[in-house]
């Protein structure tokens, strides 16, 4: 199911294009560590886009009742409690809207399913970079592209649940 939100869709297309360009560039480089650094950068970028996209979907849902005070409260609560998205944090925020929303999400994405494993990998890579630095990068652009393609259904499902 394609993403209906134009802003999110455009960001996902940008990432896909960036991955294509990076793979072409990396193929011309003699030092594989350059590709690993680039892959790690793209991984962190993907996580940022995921955070922003998921928050945007929650904000859009928060404004549906047309009550700015309620929406502002919800948006601040989401911003405060939601970064480095994980299965449980997404489920908890969905549950605040409606327990059925989190149940639908948890039913679709079991703890060890491919999509959640990809999301966890993206988070782990970013955390390792932030806390251990770039001294031991072994990430490939193909790995990042694989993770990216596997997390898109998470955004699609959140958009579907909140619609």
Question: What residue ranges belong to the model's regions?
Answer:
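Amphipathic, Lys/Arg-enriched alpha-helical patches that create a basic surface
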Residues: 116, 120-128, 139-163
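Charge-rich, solvent-exposed alpha-helical interaction surfaces
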Residues: 11, 18-21, 73, 93, ...
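Charged alpha-helical initiation segments
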Residues: 1-40
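Short, hydrophobic, well-ordered secondary-structure elements
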Residues: 38-59
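Generic structural signal for well-ordered, non-transmembrane alpha-helical segments
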Residues: 6, 13-16, 20, 44, ...
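Short, solvent-exposed segments of well-ordered alpha helices
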Residues: 2, 6, 33-41, 113-120, ...
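Flexible secondary-structure boundary motifs
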Residues: 64-138
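Charged/polar positions within long, soluble alpha-helices
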Residues: 20, 24, 54-62, 106, ...
């Amino acid at each position: 199911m394609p993403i209906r939100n134009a802003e999110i869709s455009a960001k996902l297309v940008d990432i896909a294009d960036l991955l294509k360009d990076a793979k072409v560039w990396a193929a011309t480089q003699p030092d594989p560590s350059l590709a690993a650094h680039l892959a790690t950068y793209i991984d962190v970028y993907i996580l940022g886009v995921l955070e922003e996209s998921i928050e945007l979907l929650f904000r859009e849902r928060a404004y549906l009742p047309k009550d700015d005070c309620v929406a502002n409260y919800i948006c601040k609560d989401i911003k405060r409690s939601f970064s480095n998205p994980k299965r449980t944090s997404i489920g908890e925020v969905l549950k605040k809207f409606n327990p059925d929303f989190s149940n639908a999400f948890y039913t679709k994405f079991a703890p060890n399913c491919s999509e959640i494993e990809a999301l966890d990998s993206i988070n782990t890579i970013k955390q390792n970079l932030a806390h251990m630095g770039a001294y031991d990068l072994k990430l490939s652009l193909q790995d990042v592209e694989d993770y990216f393609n596997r997390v898109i259904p998470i955004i699609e499902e959140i958009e579907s649940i909140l619609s």
